[in-house]
Each structure stands twice: as C-alpha cells, then as structure tokens.
C-alpha cells in the first residue's frame, strides 16, 4: 500500500507555473510601461551613469509634450481668473457661517463615554428646538 506523493511546491513556484510571463516582475513592468530595461552591468558602472543623448525625434516629441502642458496650464489659470469675481463668490456661497451651529467636543471619549453621550443628546435636543422655532416662523434660515 504505497501512496504516490506529489512533490510540494511553494506558493511562489505555484503562482509562476500558471503564468510564466509574470515570472520576472521587473520585466513585466518594463513591458507594460514600454521601457527597455538596461542590462545590470550598465547600472553597476559608475562611469556610465550619465544620460544618453536623445535622438532628434525623441527630443522634438518631448518638447511638444512640454509645450502642450504649458499651454494647457496657462489656459487653466486664465479660466480660473476670468471666472472668479466677487459677485460670483457671494452668490455661490450664500450660506454664511452665522447659520452654522457647530459644537466641538475635545477630550478622551474612551475615558467617560457616558458624559459625552449626555452632552451629545443635549446638543441634539437643542438643535431640534431651534428647528421647531424656525419652522413655526416659516423661515428658511434661523437668521432670516
């Protein structure tokens, strides 16, 4: 009664068995980005760390990309400046800070949470009372 045992494979080996094209992650990344990787000997040489000169067509292509970025960023800033006026600002931000009822609790809630929950409940009831008062006056905002 002998059982055939399959050799155990590690997770890394198992993962690359199904997808051999992903065996070397760096090569895959370079392939996806469209970059030709340099040989490791080039990276080790300190003398060869200088940038290689660009070809004329590559230089022109990069120059066009940079020029397009300059034009689009200039247009964006002009649009922002033209669209912003004081009248537009007041109309779009009709909600004033006076209307805001904000209470901030600072402290360690873990220390005594019941005290903070009581304060929170009191704040909610006060807000409900304020809302009832404004509804009875048929006002949209408490300060109107």
Swiss-Prot record:
Biased amino acid composition, Polar residues: 72-82
Tissue specificity remark: Testis.
Location of region: Disordered: 67-99
Reported function: May have an RNA/DNA binding role.
Protein name as it appears in the record: Testis-specific protein TSX
Species assigned in the record: Rattus norvegicus (Rat)
């Amino acid at each position: 009664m002998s059982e055939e045992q399959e050799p155990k494979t590690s997770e890394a080996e198992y993962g690359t068995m199904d997808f051999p094209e992903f065996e070397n992650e760096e090569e895959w990344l370079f392939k996806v980005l469209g970059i030709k990787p340099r040989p490791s000997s080039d990276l080790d040489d300190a003398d060869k760390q200088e940038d290689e000169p660009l070809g004329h067509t590559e230089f022109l292509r990069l120059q066009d990309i940079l020029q397009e970025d300059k034009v689009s960023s200039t247009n964006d800033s002009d649009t922002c400046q033209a669209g912003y006026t004081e009248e537009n600002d007041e109309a779009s931000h009709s909600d004033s800070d006076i209307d805001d009822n904000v209470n901030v609790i600072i402290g360690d809630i873990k220390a005594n949470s019941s005290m903070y929950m009581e304060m929170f409940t009191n704040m909610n009831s006060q807000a409900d009372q304020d809302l009832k008062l404004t509804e009875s006056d048929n006002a949209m905002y408490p300060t109107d």
